[in-house]
Amino acid sequence: MTPGSRSACRWALLLLAVLWPQQRAAGSGIFQLRLQEFANERGMLANGRPCEPGCRTFFRICLKHYQATFSEGPCTFGNVSTPVLGTNSFVIRDKNSGSGRNPLQLPFNFTWPGTFSLNIQAWHTPGDDLRPETSPGNSLISQIIIQGSLAVGKNWKSDEQNNTLTRLRYSYRVVCSDNYYGDSCSRLCKKRDDHFGHYECQPDGSLSCLPGWTGKYCDQPICLSGCHEQNGYCSKPDECNCRPGWQGPLCNECIPHNGCRHGTCTIPWQCACDEGWGGLFCDQDLNYCTHHSPCKNGSTCSNSGPRGYTCTCLPGYTGEHCELELSKCASNPCRNGGSCKDHENSYHCLCPPGYYGQHCEHSTLTCADSPCFNGGSCRERNQGASYACECPPNFTGSNCEKKVDRCTSNPCANGGQCLNRGPSRTCRCRPGFTGTHCELHISDCARSPCAHGGTCHDLENGPVCTCPAGFSGRRCEVRITNDACASGPCFNGATCYTGLSPNNFVCNCPYGFVGSRCEFPVGLPPSFPWVAVSLGVGLVVLLVLLVMVAVAVRQLRLRRPDDDSREAMNNLSDFQKDNLIPAAQLKNTNQKKELEVDCGLDKSNCGKLQNHTLDYNLAPGFLGRGSTPGKYPHSDKSLGEKVPLRLHSEKPACRISAICSPRDSMYQSVCLISEERNECVIATEV
């Protein structure tokens, strides 16, 4: 058996097993009769005779469909006999097995109708106790007939029947066979606990699912409480198995993309980055300052791209991370040439002669002493007790003795070098940084370090190049010589590139050349198919000539009868031409007539008059132009008068003479025939 047929059989069995518990069966049940006591005090038979030595009694039971009047016939619902149960009067005990079983069982295999007829007969046998019904000489003691209705149920219905000789006490009921339920024992249900279903049967035959199962046929397990309906499933109760892409005890957590570092997902295989992270796998730190706090001593950290940052140091600190503490005297706090002495937590200024104060800021000189240097202007104050110098640009100090150094505030970030340019300053940045203060990080790939079309990747330790086929080296600067391009397979100055394998190459052709090796020029147009075009044109011309010849032949054939008629007309005498009948006085009758015409010796002057559909009644009385009265004796007859003509079949006594003309313009081709009885003249269109 093929795998397909085995699968089909498996599904067929599954369908049969699922539908089997609910099918409507024919029914199956048992009519039970319990005999309790029989009394025959006198030991008499039904015929009035006594039993000798006593009535050895057995019973015959016949169960059949309901009959208003019980009649003899087959026991349609079943029958049963008992062994000898006693003599004359006796009590019948219940017995569940062996001979003499009580209650008596009458099984049936149909839907219980609810009504019945029951015949109970008591018999006396002189023969065998175990099979008395087969013994000869059995005699009837008594019989009772019960007709009525009985519903299926476990309760017994008791009754007692008495007559003049006997008394019988009994009870009966109808119960369904195993696996059959309902009011008529027609509902089949078999409890089961397997992969086809997990249920028990209710008293009415309906299914009652076992704990943990649900569905019409109790074949669907109840999953763990809270298990996601779409993302989880179960094959047995209290279980939660996750579908691909989901995880967690309740299958409500999606699985992110493999390699996702700092991201989450809302659908499987997604990587949505957390705040401060970027990249395909959320592994690029966009908020390095927050995650790592690289700046020390209270300095301010500023993010400048993936893994990039800048530390702005507080006064007294320096370094890339502001990790270096400056000397207290580094800011030159002492003025007017005072010397600074650095202590652990402070400093001290040693003032030169003529100055005093914490920073030597006070002078004992006056403007008269010309204390201002480098062109500074002195201004008296405090009533001559002190002075102030107004310094020119690029100089500072209480006496304008210091040249302004614009780099003292360390304005250049990321280790940049500050250059003092007089009234301004510039920052010389380290490689990888730019900006006025070297605050911007430059991608290592911005300089396009990869040669020959290599792809640059900006990594933490520097750029990395992915080289195209045919090149290698850190910057893709080395051409691989052991490849298909080494032999120079490309022509006409084309550039050769190694393919994906060493034996493959691709030629990049210059303008004007094509082909796998650029060996074909494209300047010349392809040759025109003159032979094919010429042959096609010749066939068309030949066909046109044949058509023209056929048309000409047809025209010649059509014109030949007209030429013959014109020739005959030209041969007529003037008298014959003048006596032609105009076409306006002829009428076509659409009747076929056959005339016998005598055309004399000149047969060309008369056309055939046979089979022409003409009205021969308009010619009489016509007098042609130039004709003489009396030449035609009957010419004075009315045009409307109809004179019958003799047809060929009438065998006229005369022969008809006709004059024919094919004139095209004023006259039609006609034959003029005399209307006289003997001459039979008539005009007809030819």
From Swiss-Prot:
Annotated stretches, region: Interaction with Notch1: 186-188, 192-196
- Recall the GO molecular function terms of this protein's record: calcium ion binding; Notch binding; receptor ligand activity
List the carbohydrate attachment sites. N79, N109, N162
Q: Which residues lie on this side of the membrane: Cytoplasmic?
A: 552-686
User: Which residues are listed as membrane-spanning?
Assistant: 531-551
The signal peptide stretch is 1-27
Where does the EGF-like domain lie? 219-252, 256-283, 285-323, 325-361, 363-401, 403-439, 441-477, 481-519
In terms of domain of life, where is this protein from? Eukaryota
Q: Where is this chain primarily localised?
A: membrane
Taken from the record's topology, the Extracellular segments are 28-530
Q: Where is this site: Interaction with Notch1?
A: T111, Y217
| Subcellular location as annotated | Cell membrane
Per the record, what is one GO cellular component? plasma membrane
Question: What does changing Y217A do?
Answer: No binding to Notch1
The outcome of changing F196A is:
Strongly decreased binding to Notch1
Q: What does the UniProt record say this protein does?
A: Involved in the Notch signaling pathway as Notch ligand. Activates NOTCH1 and NOTCH4. Involved in angiogenesis; negatively regulates endothelial cell proliferation and migration and angiogenic sprouting. Essential for retinal progenitor proliferation. Required for suppressing rod fates in late retinal progenitors as well as for proper generation of other retinal cell types. During spinal cord neurogenesis, inhibits V2a interneuron fate.
What is the recorded name of this protein? Delta-like protein 4
Organism this protein belongs to: Rattus norvegicus (Rat)
Kindly list the organism's lineage: Eukaryota, Metazoa, Chordata, Craniata, Vertebrata
